């Protein structure tokens, strides 16, 4: 048995946890540079605010409808996600972090001691008590069915946030799959939905009843696996440890367009520094660094330019100094004057779990002495808050930094911003 825990309106809910005055108030969270709506509380949804709606359209409604608006506070959301994970891990045999607001839980053995539905309510109540966040829980014999059950928690409020699909309630499974559009099935995207609809497969139940050999021949083994999962055959196991990453990308759209190379150099240094930090977090070394820059594709009255350059490293490294230097060399290859750049980024690839390699006799770059100790010290200094110690090349408070004009405090990651309790 599997359970899928999904935090309701996660970003908006995190903002409400530390602001009790916002209870039952409409709250929205904006994307990078305060561009568009990426999260809505139920009250905001009721006002007709759409996911992805541009901020300038919502701005007109803000005062009239008394909507509370926040810029994305990723440090807060990540911290709250980790807290939810910690609660679930303390109560469950094994947990897989599927996304920042979704976690799969292995219930093997649990159902012998307690009803899955009762256990789901216990999980829900404990998370609410310890974090202040409300979640829905879908329980089923496969991960795909658990996803469908979780979808049902939002459609069937009478179940109080927990829907269990077990062998004892087969009729509930059939009813749910008959109501769920095939496009809502886990792993079925828009294009696949169109093809299935053309064949008369419009619901999850119709997909479950499809011939597996036909699905495999005309679609893929992956969709065949989905069909088997919908029929209660578990084909997808729990991933307690995420698979090793093949690449790491760190990029942002700029708050202000960049036209000066020095400013672009600062941005690339910052992105390379962050990418190197992530690389060390993965306990990997890289042998390839890519820097890319681009103008806005929507600025039709401005010249358009996009380019990327790759730097190969003779020795695998996780040292920020090597990665920053390589990223800046790549920038020199792609930089062109006369453009208004809106985005840049650094990508690391060609990973190896070890930095050991045989240097060539005539290699200009030799292994750095005490590199790992220095990087470990740097990461420990920055552990309680990113950016305590940084490389001078990234500058201080640059104008191109991402706009977050309505950013909430970092309640859980900065000592100076911990909320004060009053009695």
Predicted region positions:
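C-terminal hydrophobic structural anchor segments
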Residues: 322, 328-384, 389
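Short, charged/polar, Gly/Pro-enriched secondary-structure boundary elements
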Residues: 111-114, 156, 300, 352-359
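Gly/Gly-Pro- and Ser/Thr-rich, intrinsically disordered tail segments characteristic of DNA damage-repair
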Residues: 1-228, 237, 365-423
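Short Gly/Ser/Thr- and Asp/Glu-enriched loop/turn motifs at secondary-structure junctions
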Residues: 98-102, 140-143, 284-288, 339-343
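Short, charged/polar surface micro-motifs in flexible loops or helix N-caps
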Residues: 10, 33-36, 296-299, 351-355
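Short, hydrophobic beta-strand segments
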Residues: 103-109, 308-314, 358-363
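DNA-contacting surface of Y-family translesion DNA polymerases
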Residues: 184, 194-340, 356
């Amino acid at each position: 048995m599997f359970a899928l825990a999904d935090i309701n309106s996660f970003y908006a809910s995190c903002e409400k946890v530390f602001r009790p005055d916002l209870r039952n108030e409409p709250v929205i969270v904006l994307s990078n540079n305060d561009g568009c709506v990426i999260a809505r509380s139920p009250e905001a949804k009721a006002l007709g605010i759409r996911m992805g709606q541009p901020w300038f359209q919502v701005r007109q409604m803000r005062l009239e409808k008394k909507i509370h608006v926040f810029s994305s506070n990723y440090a807060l959301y990540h911290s709250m996600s980790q807290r939810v994970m910690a609660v679930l891990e303390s109560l469950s045999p094994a947990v897989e972090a599927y996304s920042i607001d979704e976690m799969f839980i292995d219930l093997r053995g649990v159902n012998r001691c307690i009803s899955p539905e009762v256990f789901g309510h216990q999980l829900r109540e404990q998370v609410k008590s310890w974090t202040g966040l409300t979640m829905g829980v879908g329980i089923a014999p496969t991960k795909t069915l658990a996803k469908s059950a979780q979808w049902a928690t939002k459609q069937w409020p009478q179940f109080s946030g927990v829907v269990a699909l077990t062998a004892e309630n087969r009729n509930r499974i059939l009813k749910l799959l008959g109501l769920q559009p095939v496009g809502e099935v886990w792993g079925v995207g828009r294009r696949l939905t169109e093809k299935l609809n053309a064949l008369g497969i419009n619901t999850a139940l119709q997909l479950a009843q499809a011939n597996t050999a036909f699905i495999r021949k005309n679609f893929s083994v992956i969709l065949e696996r989905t069909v088997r999962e919908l029929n209660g055959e578990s084909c997808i196991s729990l991933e307690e440890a995420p698979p090793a990453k093949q690449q790491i990308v760190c990029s942002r759209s700029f708050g202000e367009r960049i036209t000066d190379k020095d400013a672009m150099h600062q941005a690339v240094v910052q992105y390379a520094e962050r990418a190197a930090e992530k690389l060390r977090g993965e306990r990997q070394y890289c042998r390839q660094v890519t820097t890319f820059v681009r103008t806005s594709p929507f600025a039709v009255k401005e010249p358009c330019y996009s380019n990327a350059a790759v730097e190969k490293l003779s020795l695998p490294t996780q040292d920020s100094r090597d990665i920053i230097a390589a990223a800046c060399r790549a920038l020199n290859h792609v930089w062109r004057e006369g453009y208004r750049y809106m985005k840049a980024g650094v990508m690391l690839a060609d990973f190896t779990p070890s930095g050991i390699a045989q240097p060539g006799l005539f290699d200009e770059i030799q292994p750095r002495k005490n590199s790992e100790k220095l990087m470990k010290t740097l990461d420990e200094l920055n552990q309680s808050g990113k950016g305590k110690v940084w490389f001078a090349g990234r500058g201080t408070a640059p104008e191109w930094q991402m706009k977050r004009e309505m950013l909430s405090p970092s309640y859980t990651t900065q000592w100076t911003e911990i909320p004060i309790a009053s009695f």
